[in-house]
Amino acid sequence: MLTGQHHIPGIESPLMVVLWRVAAGVFLPLVPTMAVFGNVLVILSVYRERNLQTVTNMLIVSLAVSDLFVAIGVMSFGVYYEWNGFKWGLGSFFCHVYQALDVACSTASILNLLAISLDRYIAIGHPISYAQYGARGGRAMISITIVWGVSCAVALPLLLGVNPMENDQCELANPWFNMISSIFSFFIPCIAMIILYTIIFRRLRQRERARSLRQAQRSETDKISSALLGGAQIARQMGKHFKNRTDQILLEISFQTSSFPTISESSDDGSTISPMINSFNNFLPKKSQYPSTLIPAIPECGSMPNLTIIERPAPPEKEKDIELSIMDLHDTVEMLDDKYTSAMITRSFGEELEEILPFIDGSTSVKNSREQLHATRSNTSTTRLLDVKPELRSISVPSIQDEKKMNSRPPENPFAHQNGTNKQRLLPNPGILMKSKSTTLLKTNGYLDTDSLNNNRNSHKKSTADLLPNDDYSFTDSMRVYKNRLFKSLSRATSGWNKPRPSRHMVKKATKQMRREHKATVTLAVVLAVFLFCWLPFFILHLSNSICLVIDSNSDCIGFLPLYLATWLGYLNSSLNPLIYTVFDQRFRNAFRNILSCGFFKKR
């Protein structure tokens, strides 16, 4: 039963007593009501919303339970004690229960905040370990069990009568118990939490700096990679164009000792070649004057897959003119060689690509082609004509890439590749066709013996071996060498980029999770700051008063009113935590709104 006494310790003025009573009658019941309402919302939100059922939120539920016990079991007795004029009329048992609940719930709140701080430290400082072991409900239950076990152990001496009640005053009057409990249940956990949150925010700051640095490096890396990959793409495209163009040009210069260059219908620069070749058309015999013999197609393993050769013997009176035409043709081919190798190839692909030209078409290169041209011209100028009739050939060579047809009907050079020591005998064996590994076909309508044929082949192999490496490379192989060299340089420039990159979904999920962890850390830091603001004055005054009483038990160190106000400031913290969650956490805010609206917003 409330006594209604107007005497308040520390207040002597009647006016102040009246104001105190009015404020206490309005304010004191409001604090526990808000605490019960808010913490029940927190518990229901985590219970109802699956996305809130995390380890951190389970610890928050434990904190809400301790605040709920403070509101129900501690604040209610505090309101009664104040309304009864600070006289305890419920007996010593309830006084001990009241004091034990006060100490246990306050200690549980502090230890729950410490457990949350440890959870935040592991989540921010060691995210991989947290993802593997920390984000489990079992660990949260172990932490909660330890928190409440320690809290009950700290409050157990009060139930055993360590703090006896005197003169109807239910207060914590044992100074030694007050000092020990304050140090171990508040100050040590507070120091640990401050250290942990300092490390956490330092890690967050370092992570933000590293993220900014990665973004800056990523922009530069993207520019470099775009340039390199773009260059590789351009090189591949130019390589295709170069292959098509080289197939046509090398077809012209490959017949330097056996026939005129062909007039390619698929040439990209026909206007350049045609005027040079047309000057020799006057020496060609008419198509209808001589019979032709069709030789079956010859499969070729290189840049020319098949050839169709048509023989047309030339009249004897044209032999001299054909020889002179061939001599002039070497100058034309040499000019074409200079034009398309040094000008176009070097300009398009750089000097590095010239190293690959020895592998193009199996047996020709820029330098060696020129040497062969000069050597052939010298040989043709000093060698007399044999009594072998020249012939005309019509060669149809499908292109490898675009399968365009290239046809020509120029007269053939009557001189095949010869070794200086070869001796020729005239035997009636016409139509012998020799095929080399390159695109040059050696064809004579004369007479060769077996030794001459073998020597010719051996000399060709020997000359080819000087031009080629150990293996025969087609144009595709040479371009593959260039591509491998290019991508090796790219791999050196982009070392470290070949690590497997996570999918966009995983990156997005990880980014979202990190933002959520950051927001949760900020929210809990605010909770810790508010907790320290509410409870630190009480424990400082409480510890100071206990030390003072230990030194001098008869002195009145700190008055009743400051301790009473500091106690209710600590109780106020239990009703502020749900407000903090509502302001700083969108998920809790949505959950509160769904509960208060009976799920109306969630259904919509």
UniProtKB/Swiss-Prot annotation:
<feature type="region of interest" description="Disordered">
    <location>
        <begin position="399"/>
        <end position="430"/>
    </location>
</feature>
<dbReference type="Pfam" id="PF00001">
    <property type="entry name" value="7tm_1"/>
</dbReference>
<feature type="transmembrane region" description="Helical; Name=3">
    <location>
        <begin position="97"/>
        <end position="117"/>
    </location>
</feature>
<feature type="topological domain" description="Extracellular">
    <location>
        <begin position="542"/>
        <end position="559"/>
    </location>
</feature>
<comment type="similarity">
    <text>Belongs to the G-protein coupled receptor 1 family.</text>
</comment>
<feature type="topological domain" description="Extracellular">
    <location>
        <begin position="163"/>
        <end position="179"/>
    </location>
</feature>
<dbReference type="GO" id="GO:0004930">
    <property type="term" value="F:G protein-coupled receptor activity"/>
</dbReference>
<feature type="topological domain" description="Cytoplasmic">
    <location>
        <begin position="201"/>
        <end position="520"/>
    </location>
</feature>
<comment type="function">
    <text>Receptor for dopamine. The activity of this receptor is mediated by G proteins which activate adenylyl cyclase. In terms of antagonist responses, would be classed with the D2-like dopamine receptor group. Mediates the effect of dopamine on the inhibition of locomotion. Acts as an antagonist of dop-1.</text>
</comment>
<keyword id="KW-1015">Disulfide bond</keyword>
<feature type="transmembrane region" description="Helical; Name=5">
    <location>
        <begin position="180"/>
        <end position="200"/>
    </location>
</feature>
<keyword id="KW-0675">Receptor</keyword>
<keyword id="KW-0807">Transducer</keyword>
<dbReference type="GO" id="GO:0001591">
    <property type="term" value="F:dopamine neurotransmitter receptor activity, coupled via Gi/Go"/>
</dbReference>
<feature type="topological domain" description="Cytoplasmic">
    <location>
        <begin position="45"/>
        <end position="58"/>
    </location>
</feature>
<keyword id="KW-0812">Transmembrane</keyword>
<feature type="transmembrane region" description="Helical; Name=4">
    <location>
        <begin position="142"/>
        <end position="162"/>
    </location>
</feature>
<keyword id="KW-1003">Cell membrane</keyword>
<dbReference type="InterPro" id="IPR000276">
    <property type="entry name" value="GPCR_Rhodpsn"/>
</dbReference>
<keyword id="KW-1133">Transmembrane helix</keyword>
<dbReference type="GO" id="GO:0005886">
    <property type="term" value="C:plasma membrane"/>
</dbReference>
<feature type="topological domain" description="Cytoplasmic">
    <location>
        <begin position="118"/>
        <end position="141"/>
    </location>
</feature>
<feature type="topological domain" description="Extracellular">
    <location>
        <begin position="80"/>
        <end position="96"/>
    </location>
</feature>
<dbReference type="GO" id="GO:0045202">
    <property type="term" value="C:synapse"/>
</dbReference>
<feature type="disulfide bond">
    <location>
        <begin position="95"/>
        <end position="170"/>
    </location>
</feature>
<feature type="transmembrane region" description="Helical; Name=7">
    <location>
        <begin position="560"/>
        <end position="580"/>
    </location>
</feature>
<keyword id="KW-0472">Membrane</keyword>
<feature type="topological domain" description="Extracellular">
    <location>
        <begin position="1"/>
        <end position="23"/>
    </location>
</feature>
<dbReference type="InterPro" id="IPR017452">
    <property type="entry name" value="GPCR_Rhodpsn_7TM"/>
</dbReference>
<feature type="transmembrane region" description="Helical; Name=1">
    <location>
        <begin position="24"/>
        <end position="44"/>
    </location>
</feature>
<feature type="transmembrane region" description="Helical; Name=6">
    <location>
        <begin position="521"/>
        <end position="541"/>
    </location>
</feature>
<keyword id="KW-0297">G-protein coupled receptor</keyword>
<feature type="topological domain" description="Cytoplasmic">
    <location>
        <begin position="581"/>
        <end position="604"/>
    </location>
</feature>
<feature type="transmembrane region" description="Helical; Name=2">
    <location>
        <begin position="59"/>
        <end position="79"/>
    </location>
</feature>
<protein>
    <recommendedName>
        <fullName>Dopamine receptor 3</fullName>
    </recommendedName>
</protein>
